[in-house]
């Protein structure tokens, strides 16, 4: 037991030093600063309205609730790709989890990337001396990408047969082509308790508050500040407040069928007024999902998510649908979601994920 706690201390120690160092610096609040991760992990969860804190039990648990990694029994690998806004925004997720048989613990590594690629950089296509476009401007146009990335290192174990817990060390990187980038870090923690067929889960994302450090490469802007009269932006430090996720799930066997229901509530502390349920600066985001599985082979799913309001206080709820197939050690899942409210013109999201156990 003593060795176990020493391992946890060594795992957390570098990040605790970062937090102490950051406390001496000035940070501005970053509303929606970690929202690129809200896309999630795995198409199964999307089909269930992202209600997954209590029922997650595979490699994707590193995102939904790291305590769920304690259920991983063999090497578990997952990959997911999705596109939004007519393919403009791409999202990729990959993860691997490995159980440590001797200690009944699991370690995992996850990677997330959301980006817009092939953006035209037209700055050098402008002749600043003539104040006109250059001849053959296409020869001066370069392409760049804007991307948000995250790396999550996870550890989970069981405190008892009913109780499991897990922690994440998270590193994020935002890159705006060659012009600017930011690095950030935080810790997540989660617990899950099982009572028969009922599970209760709690997950605190960015438990330590995410600290992000921006830097701008002013050399990339040349003398455009003098030409256009625009002020070149400067880097600043940002902080992202914690998010508290709570969920409950219940499963019931009905002959060859297994029926699973889940309900989650996400509590954010960023004064998000677009959500229907608010209490001061705290917003409450409910998620509900239902899954029916036949002989542990074929699954159909449905859910509700994104309860929002518009300027006229009209309430909108986004429905989700999904399906999954399990063939030996291969899991293929599909999820579908529609943008709600005033964003319906932005289309729908189709998500496919693949998971393999070895």
Where are these predicted regions, by residue range?
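Bacterial N-terminal signal peptides that target proteins for export
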Residues: 1-10
């Amino acid at each position: 037991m003593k060795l176990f706690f020493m391992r946890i201390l060594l795992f957390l120690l570098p990040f605790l030093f970062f937090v102490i160092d950051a406390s001496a610096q000035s940070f501005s609040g970053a509303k929606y600063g970690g929202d690129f991760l809200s896309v999630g992990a795995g198409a199964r969860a999307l089909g269930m309205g992202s209600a997954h804190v209590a029922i997650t039990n595979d490699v994707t648990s590193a995102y939904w609730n790291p305590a769920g990694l304690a259920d991983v029994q063999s090497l578990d690998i997952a990959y997911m790709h999705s596109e939004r806004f007519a393919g403009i925004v791409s999202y990729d997720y990959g993860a691997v989890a490995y159980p440590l048989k001797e200690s009944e613990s699991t370690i995992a590594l996850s990677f997330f990337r959301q980006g817009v690629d092939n953006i035209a950089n037209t700055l050098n296509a402008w002749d600043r001396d003539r104040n006109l476009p250059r001849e053959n401007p296409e020869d001066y146009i370069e392409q760049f990408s804007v991307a948000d990335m995250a790396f999550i290192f996870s550890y989970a174990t069981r405190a008892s047969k009913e109780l499991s817990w897990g922690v994440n060390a998270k590193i994020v990187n935002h890159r705006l082509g060659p012009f600017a980038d930011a690095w950030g870090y935080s810790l997540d923690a989660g617990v899950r308790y099982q009572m028969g067929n009922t599970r209760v889960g709690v997950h605190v994302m960015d438990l330590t508050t995410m600290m992000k450090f921006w830097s701008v490469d002013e050399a990339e802007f040349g003398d455009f500040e003098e030409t256009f009269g625009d002020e070149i932006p400067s880097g600043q430090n940002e902080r992202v407040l914690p998010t508290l996720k709570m969920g409950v799930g219940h499963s019931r066997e009905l002959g060859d069928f297994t029926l699973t229901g889940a309900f989650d509530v996400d509590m954010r502390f960023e004064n998000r007024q677009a959500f229907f349920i608010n209490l001061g600066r705290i917003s409450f985001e409910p998620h509900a999902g239902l899954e029916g599985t036949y002989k542990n082979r074929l699954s159909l799913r449905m859910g509700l998510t994104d309860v929002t309001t518009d300027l006229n206080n009209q309430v909108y709820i986004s429905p989700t649908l999904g399906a999954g197939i399990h063939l030996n050690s291969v899991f293929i899942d599909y999820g579908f979601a529609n943008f709600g409210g005033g964003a319906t013109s932005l289309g729908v999201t189709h998500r496919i994920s693949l998971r393999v156990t070895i």
